[in-house]
């Protein structure tokens, strides 16, 4: 059961002490993400756990572009391997609006191939909470054979996820 395991977001915390609080607290407003990085990590975790309702509810309505809960449920559903957050920031504009960005690589395996979503995601703070708006995709380069594995196992890539 995931509740007593390390959270998929990469925080090294137990899921119930990490993203589960955000996943369960969203509807009640009891616990909301406090910054873009926390929201992005909780969204990655929601993808891993197939909590697509959370994905839709944390995606700003003006940027959904027709994305629906049903589409997310239909897939495809890759095997998520690991998350690397490369940078994160949030800023307040001169007009008082708040926004932020998070650059990350979300590694996955699908049809026997390893790849990553390498993205600079944009976030906006509205209605007292953070929302994902859009992402700008970049090309991800696979690690070298002797580099640390993308799943953060501590093994070399060639001895872990690269093996199959």
UniProtKB/Swiss-Prot annotation:
InterPro entries: NTF2-like_dom_sf, SEC_C_motif, UPF0225, YchJ-like_M. Gene3D superfamilies: 3.10.450.50. It holds the Pfam family SEC-C. It comes from the Bacteria. Belongs to the UPF0225 family. This is UPF0225 protein Shewmr7_1921.
């Amino acid at each position: 059961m995931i509740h007593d395991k390390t959270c998929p977001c990469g925080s090294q915390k137990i899921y119930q002490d990490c993203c589960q609080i955000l996943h369960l607290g969203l509807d009640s407003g009891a616990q909301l993400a406090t910054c873009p990085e926390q929201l992005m990590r909780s969204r990655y975790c929601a993808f891993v756990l197939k909590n697509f309702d959370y994905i839709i509810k944390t995606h700003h309505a003006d940027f959904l572009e027709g994305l629906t809960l049903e589409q997310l449920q239909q897939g495809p559903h890759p095997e998520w391997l690991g998350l690397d957050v490369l940078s994160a920031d949030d800023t307040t504009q001169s007009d008082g609006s708040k926004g932020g960005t998070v650059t990350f690589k979300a590694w996955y395996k699908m049809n026997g191939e390893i790849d990553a979503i390498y993205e600079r995601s944009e976030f906006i703070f509205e209605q007292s909470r953070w929302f994902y708006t859009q992402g700008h995709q970049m090309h991800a380069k696979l690690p070298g054979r002797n580099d640390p594995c993308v799943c953060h196992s501590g093994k070399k890539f060639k001895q872990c996820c690269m093996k199959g």
